[in-house]
Amino acid sequence: MDLLGAHVSIAGGIHNAVDRGVSSGCGVIQIFTQNSNQWKGKAVSPADAQLFRDKLTASGLSHVVSHDIYLINLAAAPGEVKDKSLIAFKEEMQRCAALGIDKIVMHPGSHTGDGEETGIRRICEAFDQLFAEVPEFTGKVLLENTAGQGTNLGYRFDHLKSIIEGSSYPTRFGVCFDTCHAFASGYPIADRDGYRRTFDEFDSALGIDKLMAFHLNDSKKGLGCKVDRHEHIGAGALGLEPFRFILNDPHFKLVPKFIETPKGDADEMDVVNLKLLRSLVEG
């Protein structure tokens, strides 16, 4: 099973994402289900949902995950941003249920100066509300580790653990591990020893079975920079070795892996980056 793929565009209709993934050589795809820079997304019509499902079945793609829009901040204080965030994530869950997508990747959010403990509590409360309000979404939310910019939460594994354990629905969560974000937040995954120590820490905090997706991105900046800037595979500060480690780690053999690297014209760089990653697989 090919578990390497990319984030692909839904321009022209959500079903077009399937075609773009196939043409780029993806075995799996990640999508936004709406415009990522707008609060309000369109509901998916039954016809559009069926077309997406039919194309997906015919495509041979083994996994599709959604990524929530960047505007959402479930750690926000009560007010307009929090209200809009709850509505937007609820609509995301509803669209994914209609499309048959069972995993939503999301950035935990920013406490905006109110403190990490407060922000984490707000996230837990938000998800308790959302899971109860959208029973038709029976899948999982994958919390993505972050680079540690500003007051963003999720840059340490214990943040993710606290969200999962603080929710009334702990089994509804997994983790999406972003290599660029991990490195930028201070996890030394670029060498073998640091890689082992990082995933030992992950296993101790969360359990390795909670890791349900990877974002494979190189980093433009160095270890601990707290800057989220993705680079082509092998062209940044990470180099090729951490990707080789992940792709040949038996723990992650069945975990889907998505690139979010610069696209180039007509997505041709997705083809280049995926080809390079596949060349690192041993045996």
UniProtKB/Swiss-Prot annotation:
GO terms, biological process: base-excision repair
Co-factor(s): Zn(2+)
Cofactor note (record): Binds 3 Zn(2+) ions.
Class of the enzyme per the UniProt entry, highest EC level: hydrolase
The keyword Nuclease is annotated on this UniProt entry: yes
Binding, Zn(2+) 3: H181, D228, H230
SUPFAM superfamilies listed in its UniProt record: Xylose isomerase-like
InterPro entries xref list: AP_endonuc_2 (IPR001719), AP_endonuc_F2_Zn_BS (IPR018246), Xyl_isomerase-like_sf (IPR036237), Xyl_isomerase-like_TIM-brl (IPR013022)
Binding site for Zn(2+) 2: E144, D178, H215, E260
Reactions catalysed: Endonucleolytic cleavage to 5'-phosphooligonucleotide end-products
Highest rank taxon of the organism: Bacteria
UniProt cross-references to Gene3D superfamilies, sorted A to Z: Divalent-metal-dependent TIM barrel enzymes
Keyword GTP-binding: no
PROSITE patterns attached to this UniProt entry: AP_NUCLEASE_F2_1 (PS00729), AP_NUCLEASE_F2_2 (PS00730), AP_NUCLEASE_F2_3 (PS00731), AP_NUCLEASE_F2_4 (PS51432)
Binding of Zn(2+) 1, residues: H67, H107, E144
Documented EC number(s): 3.1.21.2
Keywords per UniProt: DNA damage, DNA repair, Endonuclease, Hydrolase, Metal-binding, Nuclease, Zinc
GO molecular function, one term: deoxyribonuclease IV (phage-T4-induced) activity
Function: Endonuclease IV plays a role in DNA repair. It cleaves phosphodiester bonds at apurinic or apyrimidinic (AP) sites, generating a 3'-hydroxyl group and a 5'-terminal sugar phosphate.
Family membership noted in the UniProt record: Belongs to the AP endonuclease 2 family.
Protein name per its UniProtKB record: Probable endonuclease 4
Gene name linked to the record: nfo
